[in-house]
């Protein structure tokens, strides 16, 4: 894998700068192109980090048993655990990046049922214990790229989705895989209150082509940093597709259904001109409101310590996945 250059310490801004208007401050930091086009909630998150506001501490999950295959090791600089668990998009618990860690404690993950159905010869159901014991777990260090033009490097723990699908035995009619998040308005306040949940239609749904789902990089994820996923990161099981934007990584999954037709996906339903079905990371295809050519890597420091870096096609996984899209116009099929 290509190396990401190490982050460097940035000079501390004078105290007087904190009294500038938010947009002036963000422009002074050189992040106007993307950040000033983001929703006000995302801008507020950036400004909170700029001021050094503390992020909530996530409860520790139980330790998991897993292997560390050499193929998935990396010398990329990891994003610190407190950033991975404290800076999240999970609108079911609020719009601010700190809201999931603050509010997701209400999510009940035991018992849990994950149903695999649709165009399969052998539909089946997994319970909570199956999620961490039915398939061997392995740690994979992946880049994670948000559509909002920020990125992390995360040591996820899980198993390849293809192993689960192989047990279900897809029929010849299966062309897509549809995913659905838990619908529990009493536990997920954003599902009950449109103001809290960003006006999205719930439950959250996502989808992949079958060949994307069967790719070895596609991971059903149950842990991070050696422990079970905390609720704010999508406990007890979520999807990670490292060459796609983060909103494809549906969280707290209760249903996987193989289908003949392309399934609807939440953000595409909400704003089809901004969020496509494929959502492949592509520096040459901008979001209508900001550039995707560069990204902010979230490392050990606050926003003053972050430097922009070039966005990599397919998030740096082009050698592994570009063949999936041979002949497909990536600008039209964004």
Swiss-Prot record:
Residues 1-44 form the signal peptide. GO terms for biological process: protein repair. It is found in: Periplasm. PROSITE patterns: TAT. It catalyses: L-methionyl-[protein] + a quinone + H2O = L-methionyl-(S)-S-oxide-[protein] + a quinol; L-methionyl-[protein] + a quinone + H2O = L-methionyl-(R)-S-oxide-[protein] + a quinol. Predicted to be exported by the Tat system. The position of the signal peptide cleavage has not been experimentally proven. InterPro entries: MsrP, OxRdtase_Mopterin-bd_dom, OxRdtase_Mopterin-bd_sf, TAT_signal. Mo-molybdopterin binds at residues 88, 91-92, 146, 181, 233, 238, 249-251. One of its GO terms (molecular function) is molybdopterin cofactor binding. Its main location: periplasm. Its cofactor is Mo-molybdopterin. Keywords: Metal-binding, Molybdenum, Oxidoreductase, Periplasm, Signal. Binds 1 Mo-molybdopterin (Mo-MPT) cofactor per subunit. Its EC number is 1.8.5.-. It comes from the Bacteria. It is an enzyme of class 1 (oxidoreductase). It holds the Pfam family Oxidored_molyb. Heterodimer of a catalytic subunit (MsrP) and a heme-binding subunit (MsrQ). Belongs to the MsrP family. Part of the MsrPQ system that repairs oxidized periplasmic proteins containing methionine sulfoxide residues (Met-O), using respiratory chain electrons. Thus protects these proteins from oxidative-stress damage caused by reactive species of oxygen and chlorine generated by the host defense mechanisms. MsrPQ is essential for the maintenance of envelope integrity under bleach stress, rescuing a wide series of structurally unrelated periplasmic proteins from methionine oxidation, including the primary periplasmic chaperone SurA and the lipoprotein Pal. This is Protein-methionine-sulfoxide reductase catalytic subunit MsrP. It comes from Salmonella typhimurium (strain LT2 / SGSC1412 / ATCC 700720). The gene is msrP.
């Amino acid at each position: 894998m290509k190396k990401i250059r190490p982050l460097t310490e940035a000079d501390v801004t004078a105290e007087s700068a904190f009294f500038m208007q938010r947009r002036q401050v963000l422009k002074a930091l050189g992040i106007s192109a993307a950040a000033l086009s983001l929703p006000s909630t995302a801008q507020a998150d950036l400004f909170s980090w700029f001021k050094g506001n503390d992020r909530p501490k996530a409860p520790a999950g139980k330790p998991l048993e897993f292997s560390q295959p050499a193929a998935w090791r990396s010398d990329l600089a990891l994003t610190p655990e407190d950033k991975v668990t404290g800076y999240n998009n999970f609108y079911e618990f609020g719009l601010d990046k700190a809201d999931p860690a603050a509010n997701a404690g209400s999510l009940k993950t035991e018992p849990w049922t994950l149903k695999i159905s649709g165009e399969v010869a052998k539909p089946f159901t997994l319970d909570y214990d199956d999620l961490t014991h039915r398939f061997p777990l392995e740690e994979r260090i992946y880049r994670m790229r948000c559509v909002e033009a920020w990125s992390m490097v995360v040591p996820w723990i899980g198993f390849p989705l293809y192993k689960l699908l192989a047990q279900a035995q897809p029929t010849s009619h299966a062309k897509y895989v549809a995913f659905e998040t838990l619908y529990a308005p009493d536990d997920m306040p954003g599902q009950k209150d449109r103001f809290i949940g960003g006006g999205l239609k719930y439950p959250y749904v996502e989808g992949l082509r079958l060949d994307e789902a069967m790719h070895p990089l596609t991971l059903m994820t149950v842990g991070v940093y050696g422990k079970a996923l905390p609720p704010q990161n999508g406990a007890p099981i979520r999807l990670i597709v490292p060459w796609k934007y983060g909103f494809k990584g549906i969280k707290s999954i209760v249903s996987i259904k193989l289908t003949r037709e392309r399934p609807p996906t939440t953000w595409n339903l909400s704003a089809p001109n901004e969020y496509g079905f494929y959502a492949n990371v592509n520096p040459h295809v901008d979001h209508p409101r900001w550039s995707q050519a560069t990204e902010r890597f979230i490392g050990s420091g606050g926003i003053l310590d972050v430097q922009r870096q070039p966005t990599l096609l397919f998030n740096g996984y082009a050698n592994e996945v570009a063949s999936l899209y041979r002949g497909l116009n990536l600008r039209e099929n964004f």
